[in-house]
Amino acid sequence: MIFPLLLTLILPNFVAPKVLEPEKDDEIAVSTQREKTFFDMKLILTKLPTFEPSKYGHINIPLRKKRGIALHPLQWASYLWPNAEVPYDIATHYTSTEKSIILSAMEAFKNVTCVRFRPRAATDKHYLQINKYFNVERCFSYIGRQSSRTLFGTPEGNVETRMRLDPACLRGNGRGIVMHELMHILGFYHEHQRDDRDRRIVGSAVHYNFKIYRRAKTLYMGAYDANSIMHYNFQNLPWQRRDHFSTSDIININTFYKCKNLLSSKLAPKVPISPTSTSTTAITTTNTTTTKL
């Protein structure tokens, strides 16, 4: 069964503001049917500017105007998790090894940010729900905290922000993949979908994972960061081989979640940065089909 793909942002009415409905991340197919080639793409990674700790990356905050008036920050605040706290519920059918990988990824945020993932309490109405499909290998997540207006309210009146992590997502560099998906849960898009991407990466892409999001939908600040955990490793699509945050990832999270005591640039030397490739690489990924709701 192919789960629907939703990439639609419903903006609030300025006169009578509605709660913003977060977007769902693009699915990442992890099928092992290598004989089914979906696309081949050559990319050239150009020399990137040195990252400046005083500048930040991007988050999915709408930056649009209606009747000449910018949307008030309170109208997009529902994208973020209050108090930088994310209650979660992990399905019971994960193995102990799979669950430990998920928890290890959550712990990575605790080490360098004020964001905390904690088990859901009975009183938590909004929470992250981590589950998997059966007989289908996929990993995907929604972008940002779901609102009460989305399709995923439960009969009890709770609201799930859904993440799907299948066994294939948790093999190899599973921890890095989960960290990537958790960044989406916190509200971040892919770094390579920035609207200044084509100044850094040369080539044509026909896959939805490379759709560029304009500034009207995403707020960008600072230099493009190919070392971000939100940037695809083009040599190994669709898998992420990074298992650590870049300096900009840490600053982005701490900035938008107001982790004031962790914003010091002294963090930078403590975070390993993957070397940037400058070679031309051919990429092949597998066949997949997506539909829209």
From Swiss-Prot:
- Proregion residues excised on maturation: 18-67
Q: Keyword Secreted: yes or no? A: yes
Q: Look up the signal peptide feature and give its range.
A: 1-17
Q: Name one GO cellular component term.
A: extracellular region
Q: Where is the active site?
A: E181
The residues covered by the Peptidase M12A domain are 67-260
Keywords, alphabetical: Cleavage on pair of basic residues, Disulfide bond, Glycoprotein, Hydrolase, Metal-binding, Metalloprotease, Protease, Secreted, Signal, Zinc, Zymogen
Enzyme type, top EC level: hydrolase
Q: Provide the disulphide bond pattern.
A: C114-C259, C139-C169
Binding positions for Zn(2+) per the UniProt entry: H180, H184, H190
InterPro entries xref list:
MetalloPept_cat_dom_sf (IPR024079), Peptidase_M12A (IPR001506), Peptidase_Metallo (IPR006026)
Question: A GO biological process this protein is involved in?
Answer: proteolysis
List the protein's name: Zinc metalloproteinase nas-2
